[in-house]
Regions:
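Short beta-strand elements that form the blades of beta-propeller/WD-repeat-like
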Residues: 102-108, 175-182, 247-253
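Start-of-domain marker
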Residues: 25-105
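Hydrophilic extracytoplasmic domains
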Residues: 28, 256-326
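Short N-terminal edge-element motif at the start of the domain
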Residues: 122-169
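Short aromatic loop motif centered on NTY/YTY
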Residues: 149-157, 161-169, 205-277, 301-302
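Bacterial Sec-dependent N-terminal signal peptides
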Residues: 1-38
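Beta-propeller fold detector
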Residues: 133-141, 205-214, 285-291
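Beta-propeller blade signature
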Residues: 119-129, 192-200, 268-280
Length: 326
């Protein structure tokens, strides 16, 4: 399977999950039948441009599609109560509702060339009167040497395509943890764990003192960590998701397959899992979640396939937590 196809199925799986969450989370807000027809018509137009953002053969095609898509999306979202319209036909765009339905976040990426991927994003807030409150997110990743040790806003966001939102509450404050994917370089990918809060003016704040590495050595640096990521070999499959039964974010422990620990593009799963558990308003790092898990034949465990034998997306697999190794 090509990298483009793998990315497409990653987004498709994200869309299926977000559709299920939206159906469960959204309250009784409604758009009129007339506005529904408008939104459906807009969605039909948006589909082509959303597809070409990812699949356009030339950079110019992709960037033109991206520019038109953004303008059309904003026009669509200005339709009253558009917040409740799922845009579920836009399969190359991630759309996630917060568990409390207070906002949703759109994210996607555009390929400049084989070396550079840019992320796009916007947060749509739910409003009482159905009007549009939209906060564009500007990807600042390529201008940042140390993306993990700074609190940021919408204008200097560390871009990612989000596939999960976990909501916690501490001292009366809602804290949202975003899990996201970044097609980082030609040789490696990243998966991000980003904490999102909102300030008194309702503006997004990304990052903060929400990570604790007390009594372990897994920390990215000796300085405070305001967000967390793993970087790994482009062809590797990695787990990085929330397990509600454990109240933990669980992810693969990585090692260099070439014994070069400073080259993260050589990192692959070794069969062990690490994680973070929520405790007293912070994500506390857990160095080892399950027991030793290396397969007897020395092969690295592979992430469960999302596609079934017929080539369709197996939704039941999307709902399963990482398998606990014996």
């Amino acid at each position: 399977m090509t990298l483009k196809n793998r990315f497409f199925f990653f987004l498709l799986a994200t869309c299926l999950i977000s559709m299920k969450c939206a159906a469960q989370a959204l309250p009784g807000g409604r758009y009129s039948a007339k506005d529904k027809l408008k939104l459906e018509k807009q969605q039909d137009s948006l589909k082509l441009f959303a597809f070409n953002i990812v699949n356009g053969e030339e950079p110019g095609q992709r960037f033109r599609a991206d520019s038109v898509f953004i303008r059309m999306l904003v026009r669509s979202l200005k339709i009253p109560n558009s917040f409740y319209f799922p845009f579920d036909s836009l399969q190359t765009i991630s759309k996630l509702y917060a568990p409390d339905s207070s906002f949703r976040i759109f994210t996607w990426q555009i390929k400049k060339d084989v070396y550079v991927f840019l992320q796009r994003g916007a947060i749509q807030m739910r409003t009482a009167d159905g009007s549009l409150k939209l906060i564009p997110l500007h990807d600042f990743s390529m201008f940042t040497k140390r993306p993990y040790d700074s609190v940021r806003n919408a204008n200097n966001w560390i871009g990612a395509i989000y596939y999960r939102i976990i909501q916690k509450n501490y001292n009366g404050k809602n804290i949202y943890t975003l899990l996201g994917f970044d097609d980082f370089t030609i040789n490696s990918n990243k998966k991000w764990m980003e904490v999102l809060t909102f300030d008194e003016q309702g503006q997004p704040v990304f990052g903060g003192p929400y990570f604790s590495f007390k009594n372990d050595s897994a920390k990215i640096s000796n300085k405070p960590v305001d967000r967390f990521y793993i970087e790994y070999k482009k062809e590797a499959s990695t787990t990085f998701n929330y397990d509600s039964s454990l109240n933990m974010i669980v992810y693969d422990h990585l090692i260099s397959e070439t014994e070069e620990p400073k080259r993260q593009e050589t990192f692959v799963p070794d069969g062990d899992y690490e994680g973070f558990t929520w405790l007293n308003g912070q994500w506390l790092h857990v160095p080892k979640v399950f027991g030793n898990t290396m397969k007897l034949d020395g092969q690295f465990p592979q992430e469960q396939k999302i596609l079934n034998d017929a080539g369709g997306v197996d939704e039941s697999l999307l709902k399963q937590p990482p398998e606990k190794k014996k």
